[in-house]
């Protein structure tokens, strides 16, 4: 009888151990599946806007090209003679797995200037998160650029000690982060398929003010021509003399430059977040307007056949030009830029009292960041498997006592 009890106990024990090990194995599989990078193995995207953008030769799989009359992304890469590549410190979202990195050393100074234009903590630059009145949606002056993980805005400037504002901190943080990451791809020498040719409606670019830089335009070989501002509205005219004899420099031949093409759905999310970010004096979603409200000229099959060697039906591509004629980009559904971006959530209202944020309902300065939900989910997963172990142990103990 004792031997039977012992064997029964061992059988129950091993069943419990097997149950626990299966739970742990399932847990590890769940964690590993969540941590796998999309760059390890990718399925051919079903939608042309789900095309990955990767540095040259990052994937061993070379099937990302025309297949079964479908059009997919394939990097077009050329190594420039006597050039030295480098990997920008600010661009952790891209990889440097080839001697041809995403940027050229000769562009490093200009790239740093462009990145600082967005990320600098100085509120004197032309990129800034603005404050808006909760009731009227009107601008309140002041603003901020830095949003810490806990919601603090150490560089916040206000025109009053107490404000009722739209709590745009999350969207401002997302917008500035996305613009920074976009610059990394814009700098790349490998992503030529997401670039478009210069559009003739952008006739000149004023370069006198370092705080006025294009966000989406990619420079190339140009020459600068001095001009003198003689008009009251600041429109440049050539020649000597004038009211203040302010000398500007313009790029007179910018037709060799390139503009980036942004995917439709990414563009909509980006502009939703960036409506709270002013660029060169205007909310970013208002700074750019579609040219004549019509698709760009590059929607002809002949153009696509010439450049990409394929025929693309239903190509939808618009050119967006800034109101100050400084910048342009394309919104497209073919070979366009796209990266992960959170969905836009309509912000609630908060109080700012002496430069500190408080929830209107509870007068609390707590601010939930996006990582809270992930940490909570992780904790729940661990707790679930610990509970499984504890339940198994209790069952074994009770049966052993009964026997």
Swiss-Prot record:
Residues on Extracellular side: 27-381
Ranges per topology, Cytoplasmic: 403
GO cellular component, one term: membrane
Glycan-modified residues: 58, 90, 93, 124, 137, 371, 375
Compartments in which it is found: Membrane
Transmembrane segments: 382-402
Keywords: Glycoprotein, Membrane, Signal, Transmembrane, Transmembrane helix
Signal peptide: 1-26
Protein name, as recorded: Putative uncharacterized transmembrane protein DDB_G0288627
């Amino acid at each position: 009888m004792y031997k039977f009890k012992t064997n029964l106990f061992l059988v129950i024990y091993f069943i419990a151990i097997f149950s626990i090990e299966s739970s742990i194995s399932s847990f590890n599989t769940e964690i590993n599946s969540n941590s796998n990078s999309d760059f390890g193995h990718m399925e051919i995207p079903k939608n042309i806007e789900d095309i990955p953008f990767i540095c040259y030769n990052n994937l061993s799989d070379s099937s990302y090209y025309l297949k079964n009359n479908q059009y997919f992304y394939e990097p077009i890469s050329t190594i420039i003679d006597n050039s030295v590549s480098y990997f920008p410190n600010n661009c952790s979202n891209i990889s440097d797995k080839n001697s041809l990195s995403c940027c050229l050393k000769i562009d490093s100074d200009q790239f740093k200037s462009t990145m600082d234009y967005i990320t600098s903590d100085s509120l004197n630059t032309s990129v800034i998160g603005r404050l808006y009145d909760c009731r009227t949606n009107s601008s309140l002056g002041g603003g901020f650029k830095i949003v810490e993980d806990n919601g603090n805005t150490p560089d916040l400037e206000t025109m009053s000690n107490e404000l009722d504002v739209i709590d745009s901190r999350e969207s401002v943080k997302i917008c500035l982060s996305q613009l920074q990451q976009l610059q990394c791809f814009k700098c790349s020498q490998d992503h030529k398929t997401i670039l478009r040719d210069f559009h003739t409606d952008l006739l000149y670019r004023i370069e006198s003010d370092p705080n006025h830089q294009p966000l989406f335009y990619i420079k190339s070989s140009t020459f600068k021509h001095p001009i003198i501002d003689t008009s009251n509205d600041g429109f440049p005219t050539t020649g000597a003399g004038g009211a203040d004899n302010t000398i500007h420099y313009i790029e007179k031949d910018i037709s060799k430059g390139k503009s980036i093409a942004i995917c439709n759905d990414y563009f909509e999310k980006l502009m939703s977040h960036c409506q709270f970010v002013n660029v060169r004096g205007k909310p970013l979603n208002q700074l750019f307007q579609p040219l004549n409200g019509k698709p760009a000229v590059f929607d002809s099959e002949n153009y696509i056949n010439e450049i990409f060697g394929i025929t693309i039906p239903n190509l939808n591509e618009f050119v967006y030009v800034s109101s100050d004629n400084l910048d342009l980009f394309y919104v497209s559904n073919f070979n366009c830029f796209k990266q992960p971006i959170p969905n836009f959530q309509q912000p609630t209202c908060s109080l700012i009292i002496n430069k500190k944020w408080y929830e209107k309902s509870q007068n609390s300065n707590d601010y939930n960041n996006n990582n809270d939900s992930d940490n909570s989910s992780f904790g729940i997963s661990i707790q679930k498997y610990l509970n499984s172990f504890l339940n198994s142990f209790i069952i074994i103990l009770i049966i052993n006592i009964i026997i």
